[in-house]
Amino acid sequence: MPQQIEFVPQEPTRWLVPKLLVLIGVQVALSTKFAEFFDRRDAHTGVLAARLPDGSQAGVDQVGGDRWSLVETVGGYDFTGAEELWLDYVSDSGDGFDATTTIAALVARESLTLPGPRGEHFTRAGAILVLGGDQAYPFATMEEYRNRLVGPFRSTLPWTWHPRWLFAIPGNHDWYDGLASFVKQFCQGRWIGGWKTCQTRSYFALALPHNWHLWAVDVALATDIDTGQLDYFEERARALEPGAQIVLCAAKPTWTAARQDPTAHDVLEYFQRTVIGARAELRLTLAGDLHFYARYRTADGESKIVAGGGGAYLSPTHHLPTPVRPPTPELSEAVPEEQPKAFGLERVFPATGESRRLRRRIFGQIYHNRGFFVVTAAVYGLVAMAVPADRVFDRPTGRWLEAVAALLPVTLTALGLFAALYAFTAGSQASPGRKRAVAALHTILHLGVVIGVVDLLLHISGVAAADPWMRAVLGGAVGALLGPLMVAVYLWIADHWQVNSNELYAACANESYKNFLRLRVNRDGLTVYPVGVRLPVRWRFDQNLPGTAPTDSQERGEWASKPWFRPTQDIRPEIIEDPIHIPPKRPHGHPASSSSACPG
């Protein structure tokens, strides 16, 4: 592969690799603590974007003749001049090369015809690409962006006669370096192949045709919207015309966590209530972070879609709550008779049965996390040293103090192991009692194996068993072989209790069931086409690419636009469900028809 492509294709992230676990822990701790003293978004508050007078259009002639400059008006980046506009939404994309490139290749195509149960659906490439967060894994650096996002997207659309615009919001993985790399990559006017970035902040507003608006907020690490960002959107909210329709993008689908954490949705609810308020109708909310497709809908047609299938490992769909009622803390004071909306789960991809079946992959995939066996070997060796070298309860009656003293080291070690394994459940949205129960089970699984090994050694050679280093060596060897399997057994069982499900599926690193959204805005409203790919394809560098650019301008353009990689087999995109049509609501009235799936 030539060095001119300027990036190195990456394998999917293996989340249980010890070195990576340490690095992520350090990054999370530093970024969280650093954010308490300095929020990089505060620096964006003073950034003055070039603006046109209210109501004017950002066009070629108005931007100093620079064809690829986009001016931000008081209503946002202005795309209102088109009668019809297509957009693409991709989230959680920057992971393994094959999966990311598969999605990038579909987004790059000028058109897609999607087969569905009711026939085919023709779609056009988005003039705008919105990236919904987590553009690089495991954490953002310029190198990771180059290898895991820029390279794959640029290789599928190196150049085009009709360049497109790209906007992005950061997810938690983009925030792990304090947003420094994100600002460099997306807020400095860089090109990513045929896509041009133009935003100056980590959040943005797009003014779309027919009084539709796409607002994308940056909720940082702690689901927080800073005051400068609130002022930015408040200014745009005041410029809205009557009958405005809002599509809201956020990096986290907070509504899915509302049952376990009643405060999870507070920030987005506050934004909706105070910034959007009665000035506009919130019709659709988009989020990533969870790596699947899931659509929620209320009786009045408002929809919330999770579409985090841009390239990262598959997340489980079988634990999604339904219905969800995102709590509104101050609603009872403002409008006592009004109750929170109920959002019912309409469709998931993959189906819940398939999601459950895929968790069995953990028993083989656990061993693909290189170096993880070192962790289990070290733990087993330490526990084996603490296990008594004889059968404590076979000692003569009356020597109970000796028995207690013999059991003290292994007891303390077991308590330490339990504490560590309980901390391992911290990211799960389960009750503390359930977490303690599964942590105890996890501890018992490992202790049972180690005690069994020491007991076997006692049967073979009491002299060898008396040597703590001999026990440590044997325990470490068994830990390397069986320790990962015991972790896999634990993760499989814990998922049934909705604990450590994310860790289970992250360890599987399953690249199947990718997805993205294609949106069309026209006079009839907004139509969402959810695009799915059950299996990403493998890619090989195209050795037949001509190395010298032709002199003719037309031929040079065709030469520059050729993809650098070829798939080893055809990509098979499909429509996950019938297109979701959201008609516009009339000011102070009702929609012409409710949000529904349409045949195309």
Residue spans for each PLM region:
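Conserved beta-sheet core of the metallophosphoesterase superfamily
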Residues: 168, 263-328, 481-514
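Acidic, histidine-bearing metal-coordination/catalytic regions of metal-dependent phosphoesterases
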Residues: 1-130, 136-170, 176-210, 326-600
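Membrane-proximal envelope and lipid/glycan-remodeling enzymes
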Residues: 245-247, 257-262, 270-271, 303-305, ...
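Active-site neighborhood of phospho(di)ester-bond hydrolases with catalytic His/Asp-centered motifs
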Residues: 90-91, 128-134, 162-172, 217, ...
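Active-site environment of divalent metal-dependent phosphoester hydrolases
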Residues: 96-98, 137-140, 170-179, 222-225, ...
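Active-site-proximal beta-strand elements of phosphoester/diester hydrolases
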Residues: 84-95, 211-221, 247-251, 302-310, ...
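Active-site-proximal segments of metal-dependent phosphoesterases and phosphodiesterases across multiple
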Residues: 98, 227-229, 241-283, 366-370
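Preference for well-ordered, secondary-structure-rich cores of eukaryotic proteins
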Residues: 187-191, 201-204, 209, 217, ...
